[in-house]
């Protein structure tokens, strides 16, 4: 079974990816892990990627796509299948993945898309606060401190509502063309992510049992 998992930041994609891998024994291929392994093993693409990273430059798409192809060419993929997590990030990468899979003779079986309303994600992601003295992390809504005094807490720049909204907007703009691309191929399975973690996974399980 060969799968992609998609979802906006905060939608619970990482949690569900781990559950899918545990239950269905597919290889979990995340972008970060792929890059680290390729660089550690000094593969052709790994060496190229490291040269860009060492200079503080963005790794170009052709190198990222090359690393994906190297990973999908490995023997374990034929036996277990895969769950791609964090790639493709752009429509160009989605087209590149189509070409890679065709070249390797691999069919994509499904795209799991975890849907959560962006306004819920904004609340979820921008509610994190940190105690100035202890460094303890709380959430204004879901895990508030017992005695909340605003002056005693701060927010990281990354967690401020305006920063979170910008990040969500970028992800939505990049993600919509990718989802449309896979919808045209009837591969997308939308999963309601605004429910209990186990209920989300139960919905995913029902989809994947049919794809097995």
Swiss-Prot record:
Quaternary structure, from the entry: Monomer.
Residues holding AMP: 31, 36, 57-59, 86-89, 93, 156, 167
Any Pfam family the entry gives: ADK
Region of interest: LID: 127-159
Kinase found in the keyword field: yes
Family to which this protein belongs: Belongs to the adenylate kinase family.
Any one GO BP annotation for this protein: AMP salvage
PANTHER family named among the record's database cross-references: NUCLEOTIDE KINASE
Region (NMP): 30-59
Protein name: Adenylate kinase
Organism of provenance: Streptococcus gordonii (strain Challis / ATCC 35105 / BCRC 15272 / CH1 / DL1 / V288)
Protein task: Catalyzes the reversible transfer of the terminal phosphate group between ATP and AMP. Plays an important role in cellular energy homeostasis and in adenine nucleotide metabolism.
PROSITE patterns: ADENYLATE_KINASE (PS00113)
Enzyme Commission number(s): 2.7.4.3
Record's comment describing the protein's domains: Consists of three domains, a large central CORE domain and two small peripheral domains, NMPbind and LID, which undergo movements during catalysis. The LID domain closes over the site of phosphoryl transfer upon ATP binding. Assembling and dissambling the active center during each catalytic cycle provides an effective means to prevent ATP hydrolysis.
GO molecular function: adenylate kinase activity; ATP binding
Pathway entry: Purine metabolism; AMP biosynthesis via salvage pathway; AMP from ADP: step 1/1
Entry keywords, A to Z: ATP-binding, Cytoplasm, Kinase, Nucleotide biosynthesis, Nucleotide-binding, Transferase
Cysteines paired by S-S bonds: none
